A protein has these predicted regions:
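Acidic/histidine-rich, metal-coordinating catalytic segments
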Residues: 1, 73-87, 112
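Extended, low-complexity cationic-aromatic segments
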Residues: 1-67, 167, 175
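Short catalytic/ligand-binding loop motif for oxyanion handling, primarily in non-cytosolic enzymes
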Residues: 5-8, 86-88, 110-113, 163
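RNase H-like two-metal-ion nuclease catalytic core shared by retroviral integrases
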Residues: 80-82, 102-126
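C-terminal anion-handling pockets and recognition modules
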Residues: 114-180
């Protein structure tokens, strides 16, 4: 899942010297945020949905999985990150009924393939216009259709075929001495 702003624009732009770069609009849509949920594989996006209000909780995730994943896929490995809504027993039971569930290692951006996908998706969305929920859905569909399959394979290779192994770093936080 990821948060997507209706005005997904770059933070830097060019303007005349001494003039501020401004995007003018009368629409209140620029302040809206949506929650997107995506299921990806090495062959592309399996399914996705965009919610207008609220984040992804266990009930929404179950609804998405039932509608788009567990009803269509069998004997697949479903990888979820460590969000609390993903670790719910109801989620585990639903996925393990016909598939296998695996949780990603504790958060490391380079081992989480979906985060790399979100970065690619959002950078491409920044180049498109459209403020409304409907237009944003069209833009997402457009961006998804233009991402080559090779990119999806590279995302997974980068996350799961890393030459170096994850090594936990020593903690740098110093223990405060208790003088009193």
């Amino acid at each position: 899942e990821t948060s997507i702003k209706s005005l997904q624009k770059r933070h830097h732009c060019y303007s005349e010297k001494g003039k501020r770069c401004v995007i003018k609009t009368q629409s209140q849509e620029v302040f809206k945020k949506y929650t997107g949920i995506f299921a990806i594989s090495v062959d592309g996006v399996i399914e996705w949905d965009l919610y207008e209000k609220g984040g992804i909780n266990t009930d929404r995730l179950i609804e998405f999985l039932k509608k788009n994943i567990t009803s269509k896929l069998r004997n697949k490995l479903i990888i979820l990150d460590n969000a609390s809504s993903h670790r719910n027993e109801r989620i585990k039971e639903l996925v393990n009924k016909h598939n296998n569930i695996l949780y990603a290692v504790p958060y490391q951006h380079f081992t989480n393939s979906i985060e790399n996908y979100f970065s690619m998706l959002k950078s491409r969305l920044q180049k498109l216009d459209g403020l409304t929920h409907i237009k944003l859905k069209e833009n997402i569909e457009n961006v998804i259709s233009k991402i080559p399959k090779e990119k999806y394979r590279n995302i997974f290779k980068g996350a799961y075929e890393r030459p170096e192994k994850y090594v936990a770093k020593n903690k740098t936080r110093k223990i405060k001495k208790n003088y009193l």
